[in-house]
Amino acid sequence: MNFYRSSIISQIIKYNRRLAKSIICEDDSQIITLTAFVNQCLWCHKRVSVSAILLTTDNKILVCNRRDSFLYSEIIRTRNMFRKKRLFLNYSNYLNKQERSILSSFFSLDPATADNDRIDAIYPGGIPKRGENVPECLSREIKEEVNIDNSFVFIDTRFFIHGIIEDTIINKFFEVIFFVGRISLTSDQIIDTFKSNHEIKDLIFLDPNSGNGLQYEIAKYALDTAKLKCYGHRGCYYESLKKLTEDD
């Protein structure tokens, strides 16, 4: 059970009706608590990511493979040298091969680890910049990470999903707001226009009807929730992200 005290969940509960029962999904490095709400009042928060679970026209779920693992990003970010070394020595299995090589040289250490190549997957999105609203944040992040213009993206804003992510490796909590959407492109068309960048190494596409892992469980919860009646919502059913950006 997740005992993290969210900074915004009390406000979300106060102004938005809960739409579905919360679920908890987990793997060997993360515990994620998801709760769906009818979108009655939502605002951007500077410490909460906004992400989109997007379906292609050939019914695939778009997922991004991060260039850097979560652990590597944390090791680089932290200034505490003791913590850097401890994370590296204790959890090097959660790094990819290149990261292990770089850090082994940096610390002059060679941890006993399997020769695995870690890949951390995420949904497109990120932290809103100063002054950005939800549509603007999603438009920018999807363009930067996946190279898709907002004119191809349609978002269901009738509801949203609040997620609390506990990273059990680095012992930190993160919050995220998920929206469900569609892309008026096939998975092949998206791959053709995608350009590997400093955040995203490549793309993968999941089958919404079968699979395993955290990203599949998140998508299944979101897509099942999308079938429910969102009485009292103040959003739109698959509105163009471009139009949402212009309207706001």
UniProtKB/Swiss-Prot annotation:
The active site is at E141. Changing E145Q: Complete loss of decapping activity. Changing D120A: 90% loss of decapping activity. A motif (Nudix box) lies at residues 126-147. InterPro entries: NUDIX_hydrolase-like_dom_sf, NUDIX_hydrolase_CS, NUDIX_hydrolase_dom, Vaccinia_D10_decapping, Vaccinia_D10_N. Changing K220A: 75% loss of decapping activity. Mn(2+) binds at E145. Its EC number is 3.1.3.-. GO terms for molecular function: metal ion binding; phosphatase activity. Residues 45-227 form the Nudix hydrolase domain. Belongs to the Nudix hydrolase family. This is mRNA-decapping protein OPG122. The gene is OPG122.
